[in-house]
């Protein structure tokens, strides 16, 4: 089986399991980027605990779902965002979030993976990876 975009597979798996009201989701293949995105989602309160399982091939991640994700998905192509663009909320950011106060854009910055709100607070830019609300 070929996995082209592990982050897109992970976010789609979380969304599908939330819509089926499952208590947990199994994400495969595991990657450092997916784990960092899950840490941001956990910090913002969208998912519960998660655990990496090494199966000898590509690894799995088991995520406990809290039922708080209404929609999540990848942003493709991955847009670069400057600090000023995160504050101004340009059109493509408005496209993914229902409101200015609801949801987060997950951004990869030079300081690591974080939400767009935290990146704006730290005054750094980055690349938009995905959205959650």
From Swiss-Prot:
Keywords: Ribonucleoprotein, Ribosomal protein, RNA-binding, rRNA-binding. One of its GO terms (biological process) is translation. SUPFAM superfamilies: Ribosomal protein S8. It comes from the Archaea. GO terms for cellular component: cytosolic small ribosomal subunit. It holds the Pfam family Ribosomal_S8. One of its GO terms (molecular function) is rRNA binding. InterPro entries: Ribosomal_uS8, Ribosomal_uS8_CS, Ribosomal_uS8_sf. Belongs to the universal ribosomal protein uS8 family. Part of the 30S ribosomal subunit. One of the primary rRNA binding proteins, it binds directly to 16S rRNA central domain where it helps coordinate assembly of the platform of the 30S subunit. This is Small ribosomal subunit protein uS8.
């Amino acid at each position: 089986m070929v996995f082209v975009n592990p982050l897109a597979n992970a976010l789609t798996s979380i969304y599908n399991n939330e819509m089926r009201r499952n208590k947990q989701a199994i994400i495969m293949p595991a990657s450092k980027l997916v784990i960092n995105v899950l840490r941001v989602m956990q910090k913002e309160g969208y998912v519960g605990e998660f655990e990496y399982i090494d199966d000898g091939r590509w690894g799995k991640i088991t995520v406990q779902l809290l039922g708080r994700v209404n929609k999540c998905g990848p942003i493709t192509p991955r847009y670069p965002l400057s600090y000023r663009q995160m504050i101004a909320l340009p059109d493509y950011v408005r496209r993914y979030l229902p409101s200015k106060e609801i949801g987060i854009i997950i951004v990869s910055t030079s300081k690591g993976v974080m939400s767009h709100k935290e990146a704006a607070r730290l005054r750094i830019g980055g690349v938009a990876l995905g959205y959650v609300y």
